[in-house]
Structure formats: C-alpha cells, structure tokens
Amino acid sequence: MNPVIKKFQFGQSTVTLETGRIARQASGAVLVTVDDDVSVLVTVVGAKQADPGKGFFPLSVHYQEKTYAAGKIPGGFFKREGRPSEKETLTSRLIDRPIRPLFPEGFMNEVQVVCTVVSTSKKTDPDIAAMIGTSAALAISGIPFDGPIGAARVAFHESTGYLLNPTYEQQAASSLDMVVAGTSDAVLMVESEAKELTEDQMLGAVLFAHDEFQVVINAVKELAAEAAKPTWTWAPAPEATELLAAIRSEFGEAISQAYTITIKADRYARLGELRDQVVAKLSGEEGQPSAADVKAAFGEIEYRTVRENIVNGKPRIDGRDTRTVRPLNIEVGVLPKTHGSALFTRGETQALVVATLGTARDAQLLDTLEGEKKDPFMLHYNFPPFSVGECGRMGGAGRREIGHGRLARRSVSAMLPAADVFPYTIRVVSEITESNGSSSMASVCGASLALMDAGVPMKAPVAGIAMGLVKEGEKFAVLTDILGDEDHLGDMDFKVAGTAKGVTALQMDIKIKGITEEIMEIALGQALEARLNILGQMNQIIGQSRTELSANAPTMIAMKIDTDKIRDVIGKGGATIRAICEETKASIDIEDDGSIKIFGETKEAAEAARQRVLGITAEAEIGKIYVGKVERIVDFGAFVNILPGKDGLVHISMLSDARVEKVTDILKEGQEVEVLVLDVDNRGRIKLSIKDVAAAKASGV
C-alpha cells in the first residue's frame, strides 16, 4: 500500500500520523511525529487464533526508549539496551490501561503492542505520542477494538489555568501533571500528581483534556477510513443461559449467603466449596458442559450477585454501607532500629512502612533520554504472596509493584521538604503484609506516618482512599474504600490521595462506557469525606513530624566555604578529603558553589569532620592567639604551624623581650607554643610573635 499521512494541530504542536511505509508486516503500524521533537513507531500484532489454554485476554504492551533516539550510546559493558527502565514500565502500563477495556468481552486472541521511541529532542515526554500511535495502529489493524482513543497531558498554573501537552520546562513550573485517555464520549483513564489542588480543579482538568483530545480521535478515524484493514470476523461465544439459570436456581441463594461472610478467608473457603459442588453436579457427564465452562458460569453468577446487591441498596460484602471506611489501626515507631516506621491497618489490608534517611550519595542515579539525573526520593512497594494467603513467586518487582509504588510516591512527594531545607536522600519501603483492597492507598498513609516518625519535616500529612463503582443501567452506586472483590467485580477503580487542603494524586481506571461528570463529582466528594476521616485518625497518633531525627539516622551538617578553598579541602588527587572521611568515618559532599554537606553515622563523627574542614579553610586572624607547633628553625627565626597548611614566621626579635643569640636557645622543632598574629601581608605571609602573647592576654585577647 502507498503511505497514508494525516496531520493535525494538537494544542501547541503539529502531530503527523503515517502508515504504510514502515513495519508493513505488522497488523497495524503507525509512525507518530510531534513537531520535530518526538517520533514514536507503534506496531500492533494480533494472533488470528486464540490459545484455548489461556483463560484470560493475553494483551501485552511494551514501550521502549532507544538511546539512539537522543543521540546516545548505552552505558555498561554490552553497550545495548537492557531490561525495561521504571519509566518504560510505567508508560507501558499507562498505554495498557485505557485500551484493555475496549476489546470485546470474550476476545482471547493474543495482542501485542510495541511502542518504540526512535527520535527525541528531549523537550517533551514521548508517552502521549505513544498513546496516540497505539490508538491509530489498533484502529487500522482490523483487530476487534471499540476505539479509537485520544490522550493528552494537562498542566495547571493558578495564573494561566490549564495547559495542553506542556514541555518539560513548562511542566516543571506547573502544579499539576495529569494524563487523561478516553473515547469520544467517555474518560477511561486518569493518572496524575498535583500540589494540593481542589477536587473541582482536578475534575476540570479531566474534562479539559477530554474536550481537547477529540481532535486526536477525529484524526485517527480519518486515517482508518483510508488505511484500515478489514475488521476480523469474530463473534463472542453464546451465553450459557441454561447453565446460568441452573446454577442460579439451585445455588443462587447459597452464593448470596456466602457473600455475607465478612472475613475474606472464610468467604473464599465457602465459595470454593460451592464452586466444587456446582462443578461436580453440572459437569463430567456426557453431554454436560466442561468443568471450565461451569466455573466460568459460576463466576458470572458471583459477579451478578454482588452487583445486584449493591445497586439495590443492600449491605456490601463486609456489611458496610457505600460511604463507610473500614476500621483503622495505626501505629508508629514499631521497628526500634529503623529511622521511621509505621504499621497501617485498614480492615484486612495492612502495610508495614519504613523510612530510611541517607546521604546525597545514596540518591538514585537515573540514566534517561534527557540525560543523567539524581532522584533523592524513592518509594518502593512490595507485595509478597503471603499477603493474600498464597504461595507464589518471590523476586524482583513486577509491573504492578512498580506502578503501585509510583502512585504512592506521587501522593506524598509534593509534601516533602525542599532539598535546601532537608538535604537527605529518603527511601520509603512499603511491605504489604495483608491485602484485601487498596494496598497502594494504605502505602500512602503508612508512608506519611513513617516519614513524620523519622522526623522528615512534612508540609502536611497525606492520606489516600480507593473508590469503586457499580453501574447497572441507570442505577449506580459509588463505593468508599473498596474491597478486593469489589475492585474485581466493579466498574471503576478511582484512587485519590491528598492532604486536608487538597489533592496530591488521582488515578482512575474505568472498565465500562458512560462514566458521567456527575459520577466523577460524587466519587471525588465521597473520597474527600473519607480522606478527612482517615487524616483525623492519623493525626491522633502523630499529627506532625517529630522535631528531632531518629537517633539511628545519620547526622547532617551544612556549611559553606569560599570557592577558592574548595581545592584545599579536596587536596591533591582528593587526598585531603579522603583522609578526613577515613579518619572521622563521615562522608563529605562539596558543590561548586562552596556548599558542603557532612554526613556522619554519629553526631561526633560529623562534628569531627566539620572541625577538620574549618581548620583547612580558616584564615589567620590578626590579633588572635593560636597554639602552634614549631615546624622549622632558621637563623632569623622559626616557622610555626597555626592552622592546617598555614605556617607563620616568628622573627628572632619576636621571641623574647631579652636579646636572643640563637633561636634554638628558646625553641626546638616539634615544640608547641602560643603565638600572636601580628600581620598578614597581601601575599598571605603571616607574621607571628611570642613575646607579645602575655600582653595580649592581659588586654583580654
């Protein structure tokens, strides 16, 4: 086919969609170019046949940033790109979330999306271009997909309002970083962090983005009209109405009763018994459905039972109404040797969160397309299998753990002190020890508590809450503090974190169409009510940061020296600073402007290092008495060391009021003596006196 190109204006940028020139053997391939800044190649391949052994939709999204795109060669021994970075993993999730619900229910063919950043000027983030390209590639692929989608990034400034698709520079000055994706009539995904914006401002940003990305959807439709392949012939399997009716008739009441058991493990055990009974009764005989089909039908009855109960106003699975937060149990300082710790329990969800303070050298080094930079704040989330009572794989963090950790990080980062106020590197680790819904928001609450327990001067405490939705026709119910089952069986996962003043993070994933502005308003309102409730209970335990750091935390001393003294502190080949660090057991970081940060495992170590630096950088003061060591004796006097690297001359005439024939009659090398600084000339030479010390002391020097 001949290349097809579509151009359109999107905010302050011109976007070009091109297909038919590159990657023509893929089901769909689109090269997206934004101005001359970013080019992303997006390919989509769909398997023509489903794998009968997979009981789920095998969609995979891979976003990758090639270093050649920015004119760089990878570091390391092999000089090629390795495992996905955290940024690549997070962007892959960002693309996956809005497209997954648009594939038809029951579609089980494998689909793989690969987004490759092939060129960038390092001015803007390529993620929006990748999302637009994914929408376009799916639209022309012929794969069953109820799109296209649009996507946009929104920034906000009090004076100028909302800004579409900001550059990195514009984003740095913004109080909001929000990515929104959706179809022409519905929002499907929101990912954001903010600096205490109001609920109305956050909702306004979502609606602003939805209006603005309609131009993307229209452009993709125009591209598909010219370049799309024929849509696959695919139809869902017919609904097993007889099987569903049989299960509901004989086991419906028992299933409904099982969902009144409030303890998760007991509920799952009872449902497991019922599932086994249903499979034993309705499968296995000739002419009966397979066990897999019966289990699927049983799951459908579970789905309908829970949803019908909720929209009809019945109590939720654990007996709560739609607005109640589960009981909280909050502890701080639970681990005696850590710098700060908290145990946050909400119902059957529990997070053990630990804060650790380190030096500037402990900051995470990030090698990105934009260049190397250091991140002084890390938040890591771990979800071991025992937290849900299962055996499972133990190892490195998966995509879900990276995503949840980043959400928790977004939630608290705006409330951390500035680096010039608190120059420590901070690492927070959230260990999920129990899970039944919203462990990421438990991590937010636990992180805020642990940081305050560690003495990090937080601007305000932060709490988070997960909201859910069940919508059947015109009926709907917004749920506060959802359980794991309500997340799985519901239509929305809506997480809000913030302070008493405003929102610091908002994440939303919608599984259905038709989420209205009214529903989002209600969800934000209920989330605010719940957040204030949780903050109130947190404040009863610890309402503000401790005034002193933990005794286990390193001591930091900040000081500043003249820039021309930096080389004296460092010494030849770093010998001086290395000796100070080795002898005092402290670490020293020196900036080009003369700023020095000294970190010691103890206060004594840090102070010892500070005194050494002061000694090197101090200047001899005229009229001040020093205790010095005689370094060298000459015929006309003696050279006395009064400060590190600074010797002064005591002339023979300044040794004593009496006449001195030989200097060695008064002094010997290595002797400690008191000397008075008489003068420092313009070449830095120091003139000393011994005979004037007594008079200077008498005058009060």
From Swiss-Prot:
InterPro entries the record matches: ExoRNase_PH_dom1, ExoRNase_PH_dom2, ExoRNase_PH_dom2_sf, KH_dom, KH_dom_type_1, KH_dom_type_1_sf, NA-bd_OB-fold, PNPase
Any one GO MF annotation of this record: RNA binding
Reported cofactor(s): Mg(2+)
SUPFAM superfamilies membership: Eukaryotic type KH-domain (KH-domain type I), Nucleic acid-binding proteins, Polynucleotide phosphorylase/guanosine pentaphosphate synthase (PNPase/GPSI), domain 3, Ribonuclease PH domain 2-like, Ribosomal protein S5 domain 2-like
Catalysis: reaction(s): RNA(n+1) + phosphate = RNA(n) + a ribonucleoside 5'-diphosphate
Record's keyword terms, sorted: Cytoplasm, Magnesium, Metal-binding, Nucleotidyltransferase, RNA-binding, Transferase
Coiled-coil residue spans: none
Residues annotated as domain KH: 554-613
Designated name of the protein: Polyribonucleotide nucleotidyltransferase
Gene this protein is translated from: pnp
Places the protein is found: Cytoplasm
Assembly notes: Component of the RNA degradosome, which is a multiprotein complex involved in RNA processing and mRNA degradation.
Keyword Aminoacyl-tRNA synthetase: no
BP-aspect Gene Ontology terms: mRNA catabolic process; RNA processing
EC number: 2.7.7.8
Domain S1 motif, first and last residues per copy: 623-691
GO cellular component, one term: cytosol
Annotated Mg(2+) binding sites: D487, D493
